[in-house]
A protein has these predicted regions:
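Short, charged/polar low-complexity linear motifs in solvent-exposed/disordered segments
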Residues: 36, 43, 59-61, 111, ...
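Conserved beta-strand -> loop -> alpha-helix junction used to position metal-binding or nucleic-acid-contacting
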Residues: 72-78, 83-124
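Acidic/histidine-rich catalytic cores and adjacent linkers
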Residues: 71-81, 88, 121-245
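RNase H-like nuclease fold core
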Residues: 1-90, 180, 202
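Charged, low-complexity, helix-prone segments enriched in Lys/Glu/Asp/Gln
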Residues: 1-8, 104, 108-119, 146, ...
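A generic structural micro-environment signature
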Residues: 25, 52-53, 94, 104-110, ...
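A short hydrophobic/aromatic micro-motif that marks alpha-helical segments and, especially, helix-coil
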Residues: 35, 50, 114, 217-219
Length: 245
């Protein structure tokens, strides 16, 4: 395979970033920074995990070529949020609403048994239909009302009589509630800033296509695997540039 090309950040004035990482079977993590508006990768990194140091370094590299990071849409990973707040505190953060819905529906299952879980599942499934600030306010009011109604049930605890150890009786309901409450401050940024994407679905789709190609080349050594990914990203990026000319 020819020597891998050197990645260069293409300068532009302002970007609405999608940031996400995906893991492969060989424990390699690919971090991608995508420009939502032109559907192109600005920067990538092959690493072992979504490390705070790497994320901060990459965001600085993007800023250092004169690009203003207007917003970041991500799945809510703690290190991504922290890196954005430390390197570009002026950037708008948007939590991927599809990811929130997916996680909560997975934890609550398709057919929850309790009234509280059924109502929360219905609420969270409505997120995809919210397009305005007014609709977001109504949704949050409904969530607060739901939480007030079921607060005692959500926080109910079970205790081991012997050890005294306790746990939340309705663990997945409590986890889902906490997940939503942590996300709310950055859940509806897109309703106030209309160029901010509300999901990172396009980057997930990109990962899916990459993994489809990799399945056709099973058995690559780690070095050849990384070279394949680098070439794929480079060629996809240049194909995108050509189509926009």
């Amino acid at each position: 395979m020819p020597t891998c090309p050197t990645w260069q950040i293409q300068k532009r004035e302002k970007v609405n970033l999608l940031i996400d990482g995906t893991y492969f079977a060989n424990k390699v993590c690919l971090l991608l920074y995508r420009d939502y508006n032109i559907k192109m990768t600005i920067l990538n990194r092959l690493t072992k995990r979504e490390a705070l140091r790497d994320l901060k370094e990459d965001l600085r590299a993007i800023k250092n070529v004169g690009i203003e990071i207007e917003s970041v849409t991500c799945d809510g990973a703690a290190n991504i949020i922290r890196a954005v707040r430390e390197v570009c505190p002026e950037a708008i953060i948007q939590r991927c609403t599809f990811h929130i819905t997916n996680e909560v529906c997975l934890w609550l299952t398709k057919k929850p048994k309790s009234e509280a879980a059924r109502e929360l599942r219905e609420l969270v499934c409505y997120l995809s239909k919210i397009n305005s600030h007014e609709e977001a306010q109504l949704w949050m009011r409904a969530f607060v009302d739901w939480h007030t109604k079921h607060k005692e049930y959500i926080n109910e605890r079970s205790v081991d009589d012997v050890s005294g150890r306790w746990w939340y009786t309705h663990k997945m309901l409590h986890r889902s509630t906490s997940h939503i409450m942590r996300a709310i401050p950055n859940m509806f940024s897109y309703t106030r800033y209309h160029n901010v994407p509300k999901t990172s679905n396009s980057i997930e789709s990109f990962f899916g296509h990459l993994k489809d190609h990799l399945r056709l080349h099973r058995g690559l050594s780690n070095d050849h695997f990384k070279d394949f990914v680098k070439w794929y990203l480079f060629l996809q990026s240049n194909q995108g540039k050509a189509s926009k000319k």
